[in-house]
Design a protein with these regions (language model features):
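Cysteine-centered motifs
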Residues: 10-13, 30, 38
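Classical protein tyrosine phosphatase
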Residues: 65-99, 164-167, 305-331, 470-473, ...
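Conserved redox-cofactor binding core of oxidoreductases
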Residues: 156-277, 283, 346-367
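FAD-dependent oxidoreductase catalytic-site/capping-region signature
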Residues: 32, 36-53, 169, 175-226, ...
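Residue-level detector of alpha-helix initiation sites
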Residues: 57, 61-66, 198-199, 303-304, ...
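Glycine-rich loop(s) and the adjacent beta-strand/alpha-helix scaffold that form part
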Residues: 74, 78, 86-88, 270, ...
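N-terminal glycine-rich phosphate/pyrophosphate-binding loop and immediately adjacent elements
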Residues: 38-41, 45-173, 332, 342-351
Length: 585
C-alpha cells in the first residue's frame, strides 16, 4: 500500500461518550474489527509529495475513492488522492451503529453550521460532513437508496445529457453486489448492498401493518423495479461491518503501485496556467506545497467544499471574489448556488411494547447484543437505526412518491448543533416515525466567508422558501397523522414525547416543522451539471465550463436532489465519471 501519511484517528477503543456498550465489549469489538482496528498502523512505501501524477483527486470521500479505483485499474495512470482528514482506522466507522459516536467527533467530522434561518424559527442547522477517508459515507446511517427513475430523467431534462435512468441503472448494476437475507448474491460489483429484513426489530411489524391498513403498497426494496411502499431499508454492510467507498474501492486500489493516498492535506487553491488547471496548492505538515497534475485535477470534496475551492481559486461570482480580495479568473455566478437539501422531522412516541430501547439501554441487553455482534456479526449493532420506511405518495392524485418515511424502533435524545457527545437510548420503550419531502424546490447557496481556505463557509440553505415546499411539509405531516391513527400503530402508542401531530391542523404541522425540523444530511447541487456557463458550473462530462484540466465529481454536480439518501447516487456518479475521464484520456 502506497501512502504518504497515515494519521491514527482512534487512540482508545473505549472512547468516552458513546454508552451503548460497556468498555470491555468496546475493546472486544475493536479487536475483532481487524480491518479497522485501533492498533497503530505503520506508514509504508512513503512517497514524496513532489512526485508528478497524471490525476490528482482532491477528497477521498464517497466519490473520490471510487475514482481512485477506476482510474488506476489499468495501470496506465499515476493517481494521487488527497484527504484533509485522517485514514479512518476508528472502530466507530466499521461498526454500523457506531455513527452515533462519529456524528459528533471533530476528528472525523467537519461539524459545519448554517446561517440562522428565519424560516426555521431563527435556528442555525448542524451539518455533519465526513473529515476522514471515506468521507460522509464513513459516518452516515448506511441506508442505500439509488433514487427514483424520474430523478435521473430530470437530470437529463435539466441539461445533463447522458445521465438518464436507463444509463445510470446500468452503472448501479455494475457497481453493486446485492446480498440477500438468505445468503444469495446478485451481481459482482465491489460495493455490497445488504438485505437485513430478517434482522430488524419485531416492533417494525406495527409499521407494516399500519401501511397495509391505509392501503399503502409494500415492496421488497426501494432499489428494485417496484420501489414504492413500506420496506426494510437495505444498507451498505458486509460481514456485519460498514461497506463504504473506502473499503469497497480505495482499499483494493491502494495495493497498486500507481496509487498514492495522502492524509492530513488541506487543499488551499487550484493553480492555473492561463485557463488550464495544472496544480493544487496544499497545506501539508505545516508547509505550503504545490502538487502538479499531468492530466487533470478532480475536485471530489463534496457540496460544501468543492464550490469553495473554485471560489478560492478565482472561479465564482465576480463580486463575491472581489469582496474577499480574490482576483477573478472567470465570472461563474452558479458556483455555490443551486443548493438543495432534504429537511426532515421525527415524531417520538413512548411505546406499549418493548422496542430497541429495552435492548440497548440495560446492561444485560448491552452485553447480549455485543456478544451477538462479536460472535455472529448480526443484531442491532450490525444495523442502521433507520430500519424501515420507504417512498410514498402523500395522496392518490400524486403521480410519483413525494415523501420518504422512516420508522425507527428506538428513541434517544441529542442536543442541538452537535454539542452533545452522548447518544443514549431512552429508559423506556419508544419509537420514531418521521418524514422528508423528496424533492424540495427551494434553492440556497454556499460561499466562502473569507479568502482564508481554513475559514468556515457561509451556508445559507434558504429552506422552505417556496409555497410548494411548505405544502409538501403539510402533506408529509398528514401522511404521518394517518399512519399513527391506524388501529395498528395506535395500539403501539402509549403517549407522545413531542407536540402531538395527531391533533394538528395544517398551520400547526408547518409551524412545528419550522420549529423542530433538521437536515437529513443530503446537500447537493452547488456545482451543478448543465450545458453552458450561463446555467451551470460543469458540463455533462463534469468538466468546469471554460477551464481545461479541471473536473468536479461529487454530489455538488447533481442538477436536482434525488428522492432519497444521496450516498448511493454519489458513488454511481463517480463510477460513471471515471468512464468519461478515461474516454477523454
Amino acid at each position: 500500500m502506497r501512502e504518504a501519511k497515515v494519521k491514527e484517528v482512534c487512540r482508545s477503543c473505549g472512547a468516552p461518550g458513546f454508552q451503548i456498550f460497556p468498555r470491555i465489549y468496546q475493546k472486544i469489538i475493536c479487536l475483532r474489527s481487524a480491518s479497522f482496528s485501533c492498533q497503530k498502523h505503520s506508514e509504508s512505501h512513503q512517497r514524496t509529495p513532489l512526485e508528478n501524477f497524471d490525476y490528482i483527486i482532491v477528497g477521498a470521500g464517497s466519490a473520490g475513492c471510487v475514482l481512485a479505483e477506476r482510474l488506476s485499474v489499468s495501470g496506465r495512470f499515476k493517481v494521487l488522492v488527497l484527504e484533509a482528514g485522517g485514514r479512518g482506522w476508528s472502530p466507530w466507522i466499521a461498526l454500523p451503529l457506531g455513527y452515533g459516536k462519529t456524528f459528533f467527533d471533530p476528528k472525523l467530522n467537519w461539524k459545519y453550521e448554517t446561517e440562522p434561518e428565519e424560516a426555521l424559527a431563527g435556528r442555525a442547522g448542524y451539518w455533519p460532513r465526513g473529515k476522514v477517508v471515506g468521507g460522509s459515507g464513513a459516518i452516515n446511517a448506511l441506508v442505500y437508496a439509488r433514487g427514483l427513475p424520474r430523478d435521473f430523467d430530470d437530470w437529463e431534462a435539466a441539461g445533463a445529457n447522458g445521465w438518464n435512468w436507463d444509463t445510470v441503472r446500468r452503472t448501479y448494476e455494475t457497481m453493486e453486489t446485492r446480498l440477500g437475507k438468505n445468503g444469495e448474491r446478485k451481481g459482482s460489483g465491489p460495493l455490497h448492498v445488504q438485505d437485513v429484513s430478517d434482522q430488524i426489530h419485531p416492533v417494525n411489524r406495527f409499521f407494516f401493518a399500519a401501511a397495509e391498513e391505509l392501503g399503502l403498497p409494500r415492496t421488497e426494496s426501494i432499489n428494485g423495479p417496484d420501489n414504492e411502499g413500506a420496506t426494510a431499508y437495505q444498507i451498505n454492510t458486509s460481514g456485519g461491518m460498514r461497506m463504504h467507498s473506502s473499503r469497497a474501492f480505495l482499499k483494493p486500489a491502494l495495493k497498486r503501485a500507481n496509487v498514492t493516498l495522502m492524509t492530513g492535506v488541506q487543499a488551499e487553491r487550484i493553480i492555473f496556467e492561463g485557463t488550464r488547471a495544472v496544480a493544487i496548492q496544499v497545506m501539508y505538515e505545516g508547509k505550503t506545497q504545490t502538487l502538479r497534475a499531468g492530466r487533470e485535477i478532480i475536485l471530489s470534496t463534496g457540496s460544501v467544499t468543492s464550490p469553495r475551492l473554485l471560489q478560492l481559486s478565482g472561479i465564482g461570482p465576480v463580486e463575491l471574489l472581489k469582496s474577499h480580495g480574490i482576483t477573478p479568473l472567470m465570472d461563474a455566478p452558479h458556483v455555490g448556488g443551486n443548493l438543495q437539501d432534504h429537511l426532515g422531522i421525527s415524531y417520538n412516541f413512548r411505546a406499549t411494547k418493548p422496542t430497541l430501547n429495552n435492548v440497548l439501554r440495560p446492561l444485560t441487553g448491552k452485553l447480549r447484543v455485543a456478544l451477538q455482534y462479536v460472535l455472529a456479526r448480526r443484531g442491532p449493532l450490525a444495523l442502521s437505526v433507520n430500519q424501515c420506511g420507504g417512498y410514498f405518495r402523500s395522496s392518490q392524485d400524486k403521480t410519483q412518491p413525494d415523501q420518504q418515511l422512516y420508522f425507527n424502533p428506538v428513541t434517544y435524545t441529542t442536543t442541538p448543533n452537535g454539542k452533545r457527545t452522548v447518544v443514549q437510548p431512552d429508559p423506556f420503550p419508544g419509537f420514531i416515525i418521521g418524514f422528508q419531502p423528496t424533492r424540495p424546490t427551494s434553492r440556497g447557496r454556499i460561499d466562502i466567508s473569507s479568502s482564508d481556505p481554513f475559514a468556515a463557509p457561509r451556508i445559507c440553505p434558504n429552506s422552505l422558501a417556496t409555497a410548494e415546499d411548505q405544502e409538501q411539509v403539510v402533506a408529509g405531516g398528514r401522511l404521518c397523522q394517518r399512519l399513527i391513527s391506524t388501529t395498528a400503530l395506535n395500539e403501539l402508542v402509549a403517549s407522545t414525547m413531542d407536540p402531538d401531530v395527531r391533533g394538528m391542523n395544517d398551520d400547526e404541522i408547518l409551524a412545528d416543522f419550522r420549529a423542530r425540523c433538521g437536515t437529513v444530511f443530503h446537500p447537493v447541487g452547488t456545482c451543478r451539471m448543465g450545458q453552458t456557463a450561463q446555467d451551470s458550473v460543469v458540463s455533462p462530462r463534469l468538466q468546469v465550463h471554460g477551464i481545461q484540466g479541471l473536473r468536479v465529481v461529487d454530489a455538488s454536480v447533481f442538477p436536482n436532489l434525488t428522492s432519497g439518501n444521496t450516498n448511493a447516487p454519489t458513488m454511481m456518479l463517480a463510477h460513471r465519471a471515471a468512464d468519461l475521464i478515461l474516454e477523454d484520456a
